[in-house]
């Protein structure tokens, strides 16, 4: 505290201490939040954060593979150090004040030889072009871990099963 106050004086900034926040008998910390996310406990993560866990970003062009299998996606690139969770999730997305349900894959897309982390979101009943626009993705339920499939046909079949389950979970 003394070092912080001293630096605050040097840089003409106000420094104050805050009390430790306790939730369910344990200290709230970034480690505890990450652990909740890794366990896909989004309710606990939201309680610890004081808001839902949301990933926000601008939609970028991908390789358009989703369109070829009738599952177009909005892609958000993720810096490697930001990949706090991975897998397939039922999600809720906010775009221009409207809420949409969907399914998302957070990871590297091993079936198609992906290397860079990306968040791919397929929104149900949505066809708009939103490249360059911001969306907010709220993770609701984990459906499964990301995995490499033997072929694109097997991936497509699994995606349809994932979509069906996500729709049930989001009702």
Q: Where do the protein language model's features map onto the residues?
A:
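Single conserved hydrophobic/aromatic residue that forms the stacking wall/gate
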Residues: 1-11
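Short glycine/serine/threonine/alanine-rich loop segments
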Residues: 13, 51, 91
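General small-molecule cofactor/ligand-binding pocket signal
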Residues: 16-18
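Anionic-ligand-binding alpha/beta catalytic cores of soluble enzymes and soluble regulatory domains
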Residues: 21-22, 26-70
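Phosphate/ribose-recognition catalytic cores of enzymes acting on nucleotide-derived substrates
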Residues: 61-171
């Amino acid at each position: 505290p003394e070092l912080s106050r001293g630096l605050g004086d040097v840089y003409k900034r106000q420094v104050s201490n805050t009390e430790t926040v306790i939730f369910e008998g344990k200290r709230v910390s970034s480690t505890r939040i990450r652990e909740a996310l890794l366990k896909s406990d989004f309710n606990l993560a939201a309680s610890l954060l004081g808001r839902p866990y949301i990933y926000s970003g601008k939609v970028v062009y991908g390789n358009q593979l989703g369109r070829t299998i009738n599952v177009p996606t909005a892609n958000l690139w993720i810096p490697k150090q930001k990949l706090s969770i991975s897998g397939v999730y039922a999600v809720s997305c906010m775009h221009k004040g409207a809420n949409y349900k969907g399914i998302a894959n957070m990871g590297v897309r091993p079936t198609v030889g992906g290397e860079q982390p990306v968040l791919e979101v397929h929104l149900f009943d949505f066809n708009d072009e939103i490249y360059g626009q911001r969306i907010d993705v709220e993770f609701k339920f984990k459906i499964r871990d990301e995995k490499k499939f033997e072929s694109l046909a097997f991936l497509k079949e699994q995606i349809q099963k994932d979509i069906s389950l996500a729709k049930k979970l989001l009702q």
